[in-house]
Regions:
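Short, hydrophobic/aromatic alpha-helical segments in well-folded domains
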Residues: 143, 181-185, 205, 269
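Catalytic beta/alpha-barrel core
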Residues: 194-201
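Alpha-helix-loop-beta-strand connector modules within alpha/beta enzyme cores
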Residues: 175-192, 209-217, 310
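Alpha-helical elements of the RecA-like P-loop NTPase motor core of helicases
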Residues: 26, 204-207
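N-terminal hydrophobic targeting/anchoring segments and the immediately downstream early-domain regions
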Residues: 1-174, 225, 229-284, 288-338
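Acidic, glycine-rich loop-and-beta core segments that form the ion-binding/anion-interacting portion
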Residues: 203, 211-224, 230, 234-235, ...
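A generic "binding-loop/recognition-motif" signal
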Residues: 161, 201-202
Length: 338
């Protein structure tokens, strides 16, 4: 099925296009202004027809080398925002709130399923907030509720390194399970209604999360092991278990996890996940602005129609609509609640 870019953008305008992962906030760009830097800002998101964008908050750098403080200084963060992992998280939440205020109603931090549907009906972009790593709460479980009150609606227990809550999937981290603190954090997340992102969980931490009876589990950005690629890709067994719980897996656009740097490599991972999870379990979790390379031909979010075209050459419109956002619309509508 050959389509022109204009035809694809018309589909994007009609569909609920959704992306479950962008690290744009840490770069301290003005998201209200179109930029030649990075992958995402409000003007580019609206241009491509994005309806739901998850903005994820990073508070700690790579293991062994650290460097987040230096990164934040380089990007012009204020001193008080850099002081701790907690202040880093709160500052990024506040930054997104200010950007949304300045958008004059075009973008809203979205905390309920009803608000998501209202935004869709009224042509607004829904911004959903997530946290990469429970180290952001600095061991204080009560801060989960505070983050929820501030608008955060999902969190990964770990990110690029082990923390007090559990184990990271990053190499040489030792495959640690959830700690007693991690179990308490998970229980509190379930209580307040916060989704659990397993994208960076070690296998043992992931197993502990999946054992929780009510955790709202999904993966915001990942490849799948059965299609090849990188070190933290999810196994078919995990994909099936996430699907059984009503979760969705966002397929990443990073070549290091795809095992190749072509758009067709993204399609290959999507198709493998579809074969394991079914049509309701697969979405897009780009990892835009996550300091990763993108496939050839994709320079930023405005090139998303190229992936849409590739999918439409192989699959019917109804399925492509689900992959590009319908499944995450359903997941967040159910997870966010009323």
């Amino acid at each position: 099925m050959a389509l022109k870019t204009g035809d694809v953008l018309e589909l994007h305008r009609r569909w609920c296009i959704a992306d479950s992962h962008a690290d744009s906030l840490m770069w301290n760009r003005d998201l209200c202004e179109r930029s030649s830097e990075g992958h995402v800002d409000f003007p580019r998101l609206r241009e491509v027809g994005m309806k739901l964008q998850c903005f994820t908050i990073v508070t700690r750098g790579f293991p062994f080398i650290g460097g987040f403080e230096a990164f934040a200084v380089w990007r012009g963060w204020p001193k008080e925002a850099r002081e701790s992992e907690w202040t880093r998280a709160v500052w990024q939440v506040d930054q997104l709130a200010e950007f949304c205020r300045r958008s004059e109603g075009q973008v809203r931090i979205t905390t309920t399923g009803r608000a998501l549907e209202e935004n869709l009906a009224q042509g607004r972009l829904s911004a959903v907030l997530g946290i990469e790593g429970a180290h952001a709460i600095e061991g204080q479980v009560e801060r989960v509720a505070e983050l929820h009150q501030r608008g955060v609606r999902f969190m990964g227990l770990t990110h690029l390194s082990n923390n007090e809550a559990g184990g990271s999937s990053f190499p040489l981290m030792g495959n640690r399970p959830l700690s007693p603190l991690g179990h308490s954090v998970l229980e509190e997340m379930a209580r307040v209604g916060m989704g659990v992102d397993v994208a960076h969980a070690s296998e043992r931490t992931l197993e502990d999360i999946l054992a929780h009876p009510t955790a709202r589990v999904f993966s915001s950005h990942t490849g799948v092991r059965g299609a090849g690629g990188g070190w933290r890709n999810l196994s078919d067994e995990v994909l099936r278990r996430i699907a059984e719980r009503g979760g969705v897996v966002g397929i990443i656009l990073a070549p290091v996890y795809l095992g190749g740097d072509a758009i067709d490599d993204v399609v290959r991972h999507i198709e493998h996940a579809l074969g394991v999870m079914g049509e309701e379990g697969v979405g897009i979790g780009s990892d835009y602005d996550g300091m990763v390379a993108l496939p050839k031909g994709i320079h930023d979010v405005t090139d998303l129609p190229k992936l849409t075209e590739a999918l439409l050459r192989r699959h019917p419109e109804a399925l492509v609509e689900r992959i590009l956002g319908g499944n995450f619309r359903r997941y967040f509508r159910e997870t966010l609640g009323e």
